[in-house]
Amino acid sequence: MKNFDKFSTNEEFSSVYKVGKKWHCEGVIIFYLNSYEKKIAVVASKKVGKAVVRNRSKRILRALFAKFERYLQDGKYIFVAKNEITELSFSRLEKNLKWGLKKLECFK
């Protein structure tokens, strides 16, 4: 995640949620808005679990994003963890995330 910045304002989240593309995968929801900026946000609500579980799921999603980062187009990405993320293996999540990003046409 060297090249990507974090979201800074609530308006950025709102614009991606309203205008951007959305794709449901097993364990994660991906929001993508094509933009000249390179930004990322990883979100896990309290539905996912307690703080330890939420933090672990966010770390996993960040690690997966780092694997695909160099192949992705510029834009704003939001990854929302679903509550079943805790039951899936890392390789299964990787496969699902890659499939979702491909469906959203995020790869260069």
Curated annotation (Swiss-Prot):
**Which SUPFAM superfamilies does this one have?**
Ribosomal protein S5 domain 2-like
Bilayer-crossing regions: none
**GO molecular function, one example?**
tRNA binding
- Reactions mediated catalytically: Endonucleolytic cleavage of RNA, removing 5'-extranucleotides from tRNA precursor
Q: Which Gene3D superfamilies match?
A: 3.30.230.10
Q: Name one GO biological process term.
A: tRNA 5'-leader removal
Protein's UniProt keywords contain tRNA processing: yes
| UniProt GO cellular component terms | ribonuclease P complex
Q: Per its database record, what is this protein's job?
A: RNaseP catalyzes the removal of the 5'-leader sequence from pre-tRNA to produce the mature 5'-terminus. It can also cleave other RNA substrates such as 4.5S RNA. The protein component plays an auxiliary but essential role in vivo by binding to the 5'-leader sequence and broadening the substrate specificity of the ribozyme.
Protein name per UniProt = Ribonuclease P protein component
Which classification does the entry list for the species? Answer: Bacteria, Pseudomonadati, Campylobacterota, Epsilonproteobacteria, Campylobacterales
The encoding gene is rnpA
